[in-house]
């Protein structure tokens, strides 16, 4: 008998929900502070930011009085633009959720029917798989509870995306107004708003998962194998919604962006976010539905799946069989500690230090990543000491492996630090402070073609170090604790999700703030401040995508291990034709998926370009600024195109595991999962980094800070036009195809895990008859 963990079960039952509630309370507090910035012209109201004005970045000595601070018309204009963006984003998400709701009901029925049929819808108890002396609940119960967990995961994912979007549209105009009083104040509003989303999502995801486990436990009793098999539905629900959010939102935002850039910047030579551009509102709406709602759902899905993979593998290990609830909840304890660590880290940006100069913005965001990683390392050590037995056995493909608690601590740390390494490598390749992006900018001297060649080369090269980081973390964690080690390494990478999301959400909020400043006709000085916030946000957004892709690789492998265990496969032999055909098809899927999403952006952008051109040609006085463009038509084009175009890629991802598993069996499906993981990660990293580099090369030329940048500019010069073309090509790569691919590799793996009993029983019908 293994000695139990130091932390009593009762304490675990209390601590996990308390940490989640603290996270939610902290996000509400941040929202309250942001709401103190009024969308009125009352200067006193907009400058009060908290109890201790001097400490939290709202100090009087930070105020830089600017013309227009007391201008009622500017404030009214900002409020009007904010309302238009908010309404556009809300209407798109409601339209998307109608379609997604239909899918959710249909797929919930599929889960119930497929899993219920494993034992012919029998209601009799069955012998447990790993301990045949005991009886476990019937497959029909697992089918019913998996369906409930799926719906819960889906609803939580949708809500987290929607609330994130609401917070972002609430904060964007407030950031613009605060920029009148200095860059420090604008930074605080944008970052606090990001923190609202980060903590709300991390804490609510943990709380819903924790409550679900405890409610299911009432029925399952000591059948933990069945309980945690049913919980996998939660991860599937979260990720399937994220797929539609990422793809639909990505198509929306890039159709508007490409359309606005091609006609506005290149043909008409007007600045970005100019109110004369008919696609400008759609472009700003897109930032919220793609980069906020889509990204929020995506990281929530990763987090839910990593937890589910760890719980499934743990349930068949010694602390699952011995019913040590604290050790079993080790993944939840890591996430709980992560919320507390991120809370402390956030205070460094909002309360302990003040941003006074533009050059301090990017280091402040990078410090968030470093501080959270360092403190989290200590946090993991504490959790591993109190939450785990000193030694225990882990199920390892038919054999038992003895693991010490310090080995599991190292597994989580390896994932955590690999995430930081991937983040900083991504920054090196996508920030215009370093030579790779400056080289891409320099290549614009000779036109768009050389810019594209340099950008593609940069993207391919940027894959090398992240892949080594992922490979080393897989090797170390698997050597120590088999597939459970890989699952907790993925959780380690995602443990600081609240800080990661805060930084990610900060970017689009700053971007929107700049757009609002331009549309409201505010001074050049204010636009410079919002551009500085946005440039820092662009780099950190690329870091966030690196995190998402790296964690997706680890999560996918952990889910793959859980699938292989649950489907009863002992070895996956690459030399057998069943597996090799799966590998080849799996490696092809990310290309097929990328082709679909890229073409969708292209065809939607085509419609947008035609509409923007039509308005410039037919509305008299539009170019002169005496007539208003028809923004609503452009918003409608983006909405209709993205809803229609998100369905084929969604079907490809959702149907592939079902078709392969049913017709070709679990061995071929395991090949498909391995193939899609291997090629998907590479394409996702290179696509995201190529697009990010082109974007920042353009911004490098536009900012004209260094002598080198000045020699390439100003806006409208030939090198600048070449950079805009590169940026436009990179838009769908970095914001649609790249980020969506990490959902493809995770979602196929978690879906295979949920349906594993069905495939093991009824799958492979073609090989049975031929």
Curated annotation (Swiss-Prot):
List the stretches on the Cytoplasmic face of the membrane. Answer: 37-88, 168-190, 253-290, 351-358, 430-451, 510-538, 607-635, 694-736
> Which sites bind Mg(2+) 3?
287, 511
The UniProt annotation places Mg(2+) 1 binding at 257, 261
Name the chain's protein.
Pyrophosphate-energized vacuolar membrane proton pump 1
Residue intervals on the Intravacuolar side: 1-9, 119-139, 221-223, 317-324, 387-405, 477-482, 568-577, 665, 763-770
| Tissue-wise expression | Ubiquitous (at protein level). Mostly expressed in vascular tissues, meristems and root pericycle.
List GO molecular-function terms, semicolon-separated. diphosphate hydrolysis-driven proton transmembrane transporter activity; inorganic diphosphate phosphatase activity; metal ion binding; mRNA binding
Q: What induces it?
A: Repressed by light. Induced by CAMTA1 and/or CAMTA5 in pollen.
What does the record say about its membrane topology? Multi-pass membrane protein
Give, from the UniProt record, the effect of changing residue 427 to Q. Strong reduction of PPi hydrolysis and H(+) translocation
Per the entry's comment, what about the domains? Has 16 transmembrane helices and a cytoplasmic domain that contains the active site.
State how it assembles.
Monomer.
Keyword annotations for this protein? Answer: Cell membrane, Disulfide bond, Endosome, Hydrogen ion transport, Ion transport, Magnesium, Membrane, Metal-binding, Translocase, Transmembrane, Transmembrane helix, Transport, Vacuole
Activity regulation behaviour = Activated by K(+) and Mg(2+). Inhibited by Ca(2+), N,N'-dicyclohexylcarbodiimide (DCCD), N-ethylmaleimide (NEM) and aminomethylenediphosphonate (AMDP), and, to a lower extent, by fluoride (KF).
Per the entry, what this protein does is: Contributes to the transtonoplast (from cytosol to vacuole lumen) H(+)-electrochemical potential difference. It establishes a proton gradient of similar and often greater magnitude than the H(+)-ATPase on the same membrane. In addition, facilitates auxin transport by modulating apoplastic pH and regulates auxin-mediated developmental processes. Confers tolerance to NaCl and to drought by increasing ion retention.
Q: State what changing residue 229 to D does.
A: Slight increased PPi hydrolysis and H(+) translocation
Similarity comment text for this entry:
Belongs to the H(+)-translocating pyrophosphatase (TC 3.A.10) family. K(+)-stimulated subfamily.
Give the UniProt subcellular location, in the record's own words.
Answer: Vacuole membrane; Endosome membrane; Cell membrane
UniProt cross-references to PANTHER family, sorted A to Z:
K(+)-INSENSITIVE PYROPHOSPHATE-ENERGIZED PROTON PUMP
Q: What else is known?
A: Has few direct interactions with pyrophosphate. Interacts with the substrate via divalent metal cations, such as magnesium ions, that are bound to the pyrophosphate.
Tell me the residue numbers annotated for binding Mg(2+) 2: 257, 731
Question: Which residues does the record give as Mg(2+) 4 binding sites?
Answer: 538, 695
Q: Where is this site: Important for proton transport?
A: 246, 291, 298, 305, 735, 746
Which amino acid positions bind substrate, per UniProt? 254, 734
What outcome follows a substitution of residue 305 to Q?
Abolishes H(+) translocation and strong reduction of PPi hydrolysis, reduced sensitivity to DCCD
Q: What is its main location?
A: membrane
